[in-house]
Amino acid sequence: MDTRFVQAHKEARWALGLTLLYLAVWLVAAYLSGVAPGFTGFPRWFEMACILTPLLFIGLCWAMVKFIYRDIPLEDDDAA
């Protein structure tokens, strides 16, 4: 198999995994956090699910792009 496809499949698996992890963390944060006010004055479930979780996953997406994704040529070598 062409190494471009191996890398593309690896990147797709990581993206799907991070997406499913985000969904799981969001659900846990939204439904298991309390309703007591948090440090911003919003309910704790809102702070966890809508403020802290997205910030965490922005960092994880940055790390995934920095360390997992690679620049690969998209043109087909056989077409030239």
From Swiss-Prot:
GO terms for cellular component: plasma membrane. It is a multi-pass membrane protein. Its main location: membrane. Induction: Down-regulated by cystine. Keywords: Cell membrane, Membrane, Transmembrane, Transmembrane helix. The chain crosses the membrane at residues 15-35, 45-65. It is found in: Cell membrane. InterPro entries: DUF997. PANTHER family: INNER MEMBRANE PROTEIN, INNER MEMBRANE PROTEIN-RELATED. To H.influenzae HI_0974B. NCBIfam families: PRK10633.1. This is Uncharacterized membrane protein YhdT. It comes from Escherichia coli (strain K12). The gene is yhdT.
